[in-house]
From Swiss-Prot:
Alphabetical UniProt keywords: FAD, Flavoprotein, Monooxygenase, NADP, Oxidoreductase
Domain of life: Bacteria
Protein name (record): 4-hydroxyacetophenone monooxygenase
Gene name per UniProt: hapE
Catalytic activity: 4'-hydroxyacetophenone + NADPH + O2 + H(+) = 4-acetoxyphenol + NADP(+) + H2O
Co-factor: note: Binds 1 FAD per subunit.
Annotated positions binding FAD: S152, E171, W180, D191, I192, Y197, V239, Q275
Phylogenetic placement of the source organism: Bacteria, Pseudomonadati, Pseudomonadota, Gammaproteobacteria, Pseudomonadales
Outcome of swapping K439P: 20-fold decrease in catalytic activity
Known function: Catalyzes a Baeyer-Villiger oxidation reaction, i.e. the insertion of an oxygen atom into a carbon-carbon bond adjacent to a carbonyl, which converts ketones to esters. Can oxidize a wide range of acetophenone derivatives. Highest activity occurs with compounds bearing an electron-donating substituent at the para position of the aromatic ring, e.g. 4-hydroxyacetophenone and 4-aminoacetophenone, leading to the formation of 4-hydroxyphenyl acetate and 4-aminophenyl acetate, respectively. Is also able to oxidize sulfides.
EC numbers, comma separated: 1.14.13.84
Gene3D superfamilies xrefs: FAD/NAD(P)-binding domain
Xref: InterPro entries: FAD-bind_Monooxygenase_sf, FAD/NAD-bd_sf, Flavin_mOase-like
Length: 640
């Protein structure tokens, strides 16, 4: 990522240049762009309608028809250029309806108000607060503390800055970026297309379809610089305690930095500490006896050279499927220990670069970047939630939870099966015995299975009994000797806000309320007995089959900033979610999760806590979360 698209370009290029670069255009994006620029929505012919498969819009045309469409669009762009017309603004609601239903059909209609916030020009930010502290409570002393400067902390900070609310961020690391600063393992990259895994107000120019971690980290740094966030951040500062002081109606926070411990107070505290940042290393007997290097993928030791070494990897989650192919290229021997396996989501462009022509179109054709993002946002916002819904009359099993789920299973299996043609033994190992969506689906372009087919790679499904000084011993008595062991075993995802000690009214400890790993919150944000406390990316806000964490973070930040508006505008000191509201919401979430593949299946996954309750996932649609978080309902809260 080298810059931002921040201005609307002019189409000041000759015919040959346009023709050359249109050869690299995405057909659905090109048609949407030309229809918007010219105002002629009739060009969106039914026979040019794209196909939607697994959350992606593709042209679905043969090469001859694609060539005809490119030539047609070229002539329309030439006419637009020669007419001297200025580019229109963002699409109207009527235009968005026509363009959206052409792309997606009627399924998109409920989502259009949400999509409208994504369908903006590069200069616009429709989610910015429409109020300012100077206008609602100019003389009031008021401060917000945000804990964490990852993507969610950054968007919360920007919204408070836009609203004129004083704030400070305490970040335990030495820079912004959160997980993208911390995770440096080989092969680390996003599993959402780069243009969709980005803020709605900061349209980046990316080098890869699915950006490697260094690009995402650079993007986060660029956003922080562009919006003046660095000056509000205290780095290398770790908050250890947060206590609600009833007498002052403020939070008392204790943090440690290079100068020791300091106590500060704030009216509101926002926890933006993430979920996937505390590595989980299983308690395997003998773990301390291994004589070689041993580390978790999130704490990669770059001083260790695995070339020519015998390497053992425990776990096959999303991170492991990224770093294992890197290790396999030069390791002498690589053995992968896996309890369960993942369904793979076919993603041909997973490791592809953005073409020069695509970059040119994004930079030089008005609104092409808008529609390039929206053509992803529409199918991704809908996702395939319906494909993982349990149909109790089907009936659901560990193979499939509905007819739609079974079709998805068959589609993915049809993509995987040919890769096993020369290794039928791997089929028995790699085809999951759980429904699609039962655990996290992993993107792949064929690399994963081809890696496991290498002569120097093998997968071990025998349970591990003990780690020895020489390696790993399984329950069948086989000892596998290694020079290096890497854990790809995920994180303590269910232990929200750990290890920070948080106490609310009457000294109630939050982690006691949550019983360690059974976190619950209203809208994933707020909890009774903990006034003026909000979480970003909190309990049951995880997304696994649609949308992105960044889109949900933007929604969450909008809600939290609106809550602060309510406090300031009404002259209130505190707001605390009512217990019946909290309980009703969480009951519905639990019931919803029970009727999703991840709640029905018995397969082990990080979506669930130690008791089997789903603490991670939001089981409903993206548009429902948007509707619930668009503004605060005052009657949900006890205001004091």
């Amino acid at each position: 990522m080298s810059a931002f698209n921040t201005t609307l370009p002019s189409l000041d290029y000759d015919d040959d240049t346009l023709r050359e670069h249109l050869q690299g255009a995405d057909i659905p994006t090109l048609l949407l762009t030309v229809a918007h620029l010219t105002g002629d929505l009739q060009i969106l012919k039914p026979n040019w309608k794209p196909s939607i498969a697994m959350g992606v819009a593709r042209s679905g045309m043969d090469l001859e028809t694609e060539a005809q469409v490119r030539e047609f669009c070229l002539q329309r762009l030439i006419d637009f250029r020669d007419s001297g017309q200025p580019a229109p603004g963002r699409p109207t609601s009527d235009q968005l309806h026509i363009l959206g239903t052409w792309l997606m059909g009627p399924v998109i209609e409920p989502y259009l108000p949400l999509i409208a916030e994504e369908a903006v020009t590069a200069e616009e930010d429709l989610r910015a607060p429409r109020w300012h502290k100077d206008h609602v409570a100019s003389g009031r002393d008021f401060k917000v503390v945000i804990i964490g400067a990852g993507e969610s902390g950054m968007i919360a900070a920007l919204r408070f800055k836009q609203a004129g609310v004083p704030f400070v961020i305490y970040e335990k690391g030495n820079d912004v970026g959160g997980t993208w600063r911390e995770n440096t393992y080989p092969g680390c990259r996003v599993d959402i297309n780069s243009f969709w895994y980005s803020f709605s107000f900061a349209r980046g120019i990316w080098d890869d379809c699915f950006a490697p971690a260094p690009q995402v980290f650079a993007y986060m740094q660029a956003v922080a610089r562009e919006h003046g966030l660095y000056e509000h951040i205290r780095f290398n500062t770790e908050v250890s305690d947060a206590h609600w002081d009833e007498s002052t109606q403020r939070w008392q926070l204790l943090y440690r930095d290079s100068e020791g411990q300091t106590q500060v107070d704030s009216n509101v505290v926002v926890f933006a500490v993430g979920q996937l940042n505390r590595p989980m290393i299983p308690a395997i007997p003998g773990i301390e006896t291994f004589k070689g290097p041993m580390f978790h993928s999130a704490q990669w030791d770059h001083d260790v050279d695995w070339s020519g070494k015998r390497v053992g990897v425990i776990g096959t989650g999303a991170s492991a499927t990224q770093f294992i192919p890197q290790l396999a290229q030069t390791a002498a021997e690589l053995k992968v220990f896996a309890r369960t396996t993942n369904w793979l989501l076919p993603t041909p462009d997973l490791h592809e670069k953005i073409s020069d022509s695509c970059k040119w179109l994004l930079a030089h054709v008005p609104h092409y970047s808008l529609w390039y993002r929206v053509a992803m946002a529409m199918p991704q916002s809908v996702g395939f939630l319906e494909d993982v819904m349990v149909d109790v009359g089907y009936p659901p099993t560990e193979l499939a939870v509905s007819a739609r789920n079974d079709r998805l299973r068959q589609d993915i299996s049809a993509w995987m099966e040919p890769q096993f043609a020369d290794r039928p033994d791997l089929r028995e190992v790699l085809i999951p015995d759980s429904p699609v969506g039962g655990k996290r689906i992993v993107r792949d372009n064929g690399t994963w299975i081809s890696t496991l087919k290498r002569d120097n790679v093998s997968m071990i499904r025998q349970p591990i009994e003990v780690i020895t000084p020489k390696g790993i011993c399984c329950v069948d008595g086989t000892e596998h000797e290694f020079d290096l062991i890497v854990y790809g075993t995920g994180f303590h995802a269910s232990k929200f806000l750990m290890p920070i000690n948080v106490t609310g009214r009457d000294g109630v400890a939050l982690h006691d309320v949550w019983k360690g790993d059974d976190a619950r919150a209203y809208l994933g944000m707020t909890v009774p007995q903990f006034p003026n406390m909000f979480c970003m990316y909190g309990p049951n806000t995880g997304l696994v089959v649609y949308s992105t964490v960044i889109q949900f973070s933007e929604m969450t930040a909008s809600y939290i900033v609106d809550a602060v508006r309510l406090l300031l505008e009404g002259g209130h000191q505190s707001m605390e979610v009512k217990t019946p509201v909290f309980e009703s919401y969480n009951q519905r979430v639990d019931e919803g999760n029970a009727l999703r593949a991840w709640g029905f299946s018995k397969v082990n996954s990080w979506y669930k806590n130690s008791k089997g309750r789903v603490t991670q996932n939001f089981p409903f649609t993206a548009v429902e979360f948007w509707q619930r978080t668009h503004s605060v309902e005052p009657t949900d809260y006890q205001l004091g």
